[in-house]
Regions:
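Conserved donor-binding/catalytic core segment of Leloir-type glycosyltransferases
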Residues: 71, 259, 299-330, 336-341, ...
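A conserved mid-protein helix/loop that constitutes part of the nucleotide-sugar donor-binding site
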Residues: 80-88, 318, 325-347, 369-372
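Nucleotide-activated donor-binding/catalytic signature segment of Leloir-type glycosyltransferases, i.e.
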Residues: 125-128, 368-396
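Membrane-proximal helix-turn-helix segments that form the acceptor-binding/catalytic region
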Residues: 165-166, 205, 217, 221-258, ...
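Short alpha-helical donor nucleotide-sugar binding micro-motif in glycosyltransferases
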Residues: 392, 400-405
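Aromatic "clamp/platform" in nucleotide-sugar-dependent glycosyltransferases that forms part
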Residues: 413
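A charged, aromatic-enriched C-terminal amphipathic alpha-helix characteristic of glycosyltransferases
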Residues: 457, 471-511
Length: 511
């Protein structure tokens, strides 16, 4: 009897809870649905008369309905690897589909569309077969890190929603592709715009590695010592990161097609977005042709000679070249300290035969200040005479530096891919890269069963690898260099275009 009474009470409570849930959830769902429908109507009304030429169909081609693809790339005039992905992807779509019209949402309002396309031709040698329209966004500052000195991830993400709303209400495409990693624009265009949605992710906005580093209280460029030395602040930041990661995962899960640039990015995006069936690795296009043309002249005086070479004369310089912007995450101090560790094992009379050349661009005062501090570090380590800073060099000068170098050096922890590493391999350098991220998982891997370079993770291992490389015979160096050069065909523009077209095809089937 008591047992039946308890069961009755439980059933009654369950029914009551269900009724209250229906009473609360149904009106909320109804209101949310009405809001979404209203915003969809508002978006279509706002962008109805924008760029009418994109929807124009000639009388002779009434059988073709144009499909407009919008690319969200607020910094499309930057001239970096992300922009090469953008323009190569657009060219691939235009060559494949004659009915495709392309729009680029950009914040580069200080230049014209013609100037942007001209720079793409000059920088990447990419000419588009069809015209491209530009929607110039006025509020790009909302996604700039400098706008948010604190809670930068949160600020930039909210800013990307606002910038995405400006893009959405300026012009509504049929297909939306984010090529810069602004995941919070994806639900906007899918649910409020009714678009087919895809994205190309260069690196996750937040990763499990970032969570681990904060949890272990390690100091880094994005985890200040003030926080890492405080248990309370570290816990607060960890909670903030976890909440942000959940929100980021929900936004990313709205994508119907996800392309990532490396195995490292793939694993992190998969753990956050949970879209395994929709996610594919498409290596970014690397222009290796100009570097492959450089001869592999192992054994010439001053050009990739080794400690075992007969030309080890007073005027023979064995150079190590590092290529990368002077940003904190590139970890140039590790390069200097590793080089110092390597030189300590050399006789004083032989140290002048080795040179570390840091090639990179100085974009602003922050970069200049970092270079100044690096010069000071080289002075403090007493290696300033063996270190050269090549700032803002021309492409021709870059090729000359790589042509003479024995080692191509890379020290960034968990770099998502590593185009600079690919360029060093293509040029004939022996690569010494960080044992993490894209270089470890995708680039400096065995090719046809043979090594393509070396990996290290701290001063001691970098110095030891430098010693090993310089001690190789010319024949051993030649085998590694030729093998590495053959392996970079995986990262060609043709390989990227094929992968990009295969991944984006479902977006056009559903339009």
């Amino acid at each position: 009897m008591v047992h039946n009474f308890v069961n009755y009470q439980v059933i009654s409570l369950s029914i009551t809870a269900s009724i209250w849930a229906i009473k609360v959830l149904f009106p909320c769902t109804l209101v949310l649905g009405i809001i979404v429908l209203f915003l969809r109507w508002y978006v279509r009304k706002r962008s109805k008369n924008a760029l009418p030429d994109l929807r124009f169909v000639p009388r002779t081609r009434q059988d073709i309905r144009p499909v407009v693809v919008g690319f969200f790339h607020p910094y499309c005039n930057a001239g970096g690897g992300g922009e090469r992905v953008l323009w190569t992807g657009i060219r691939a779509l235009q060559n494949r589909y004659k009915f495709v019209r392309c729009v680029v949402y950009t914040g580069d309002s200080c230049v014209s569309g013609d100037e942007i396309l001209r720079k793409a031709r000059q920088r990447f040698n990419i000419s588009l077969p069809e015209p491209v329209e530009f929607v110039f966004l006025k509020r790009r500052r909302w996604v700039e890190a400098s706008t948010y000195p604190y809670f930068t991830l949160l600020g930039q993400s909210i800013g990307s929603v606002l910038l995405g709303w400006e893009a959405l209400t300026s012009y509504l495409p049929d297909v939306f592709v984010d090529t810069m990693g602004y995941a919070f624009t994806l639900p906007l265009f899918r649910y409020l715009g009714g678009c087919q949605v895809g994205c190309y992710v260069h690196y996750p906005t937040i990763s499990t590695d970032m969570l681990t580093r904060v949890g272990s209280k390690k100091t880094s460029y994005n985890n200040a010592s003030l926080i890492s030395n405080s248990q309370i602040l570290s816990t607060m930041k960890l909670v903030y990161y976890y909440l942000f990661a959940i929100t980021y995962g929900l936004a990313g899960s709205c994508a119907q097609v996800v392309m990532v640039n490396s195995t490292w990015t793939y694993r992190h995006i998969l753990s956050l977005w949970k879209r395994k069936e929709q996610t594919s690795i498409v290596y970014p296009p690397c222009d290796t042709n100009a570097f492959i043309e450089l001869p592999i002249n192992i054994g010439k005086i001053g050009e990739r000679g080794g400690d075992n070479d007969k030309e080890d004369s007073a005027d023979c310089i064995h150079s190590i070249v590092s290529v990368g912007q002077f940003r904190p995450e590139k970890d140039h101090p590790l390069q200097l300290r590793s080089f110092h560790q390597f030189l300590k094992c050399k006789m004083a009379k032989d140290r002048h035969k080795y040179k570390l050349i840091l090639v990179g661009s100085c974009r602003n005062k922050e970069d200049q200040d970092r270079v100044k501090s690096l010069r000071q570090l080289a002075f403090d380590l007493e290696i300033e005479s063996c270190v050269e800073f090549a700032l803002n060099v021309s492409f021709e000068q870059l090729k000359k530096n790589l042509a003479k170098a024995t080692i191509g050096l890379h020290t960034m922890w968990n770099e998502h891919f590593g185009i600079g590493v690919v360029e060093c391999m293509a040029s004939g350098c022996i690569v010494l890269a960080h044992d993490s991220g894209g270089p470890k998982m995708d680039i400096v891997v065995e090719w046809d069963g043979n090594p393509t370079g070396f990996l290290a993770n701290d001063e001691k291992s970098y110095a030891a690898a430098m010693e090993t490389i310089f001690a190789l015979s010319p024949e051993e160096k030649s085998v590694i260099c030729h093998n590495a050069r053959q392996s970079v065909t995986r990262f060609s523009e043709t390989a990227f275009e094929n992968g990009f077209l295969q991944c984006t095809e479902p977006l056009f089937i559903s339009v």
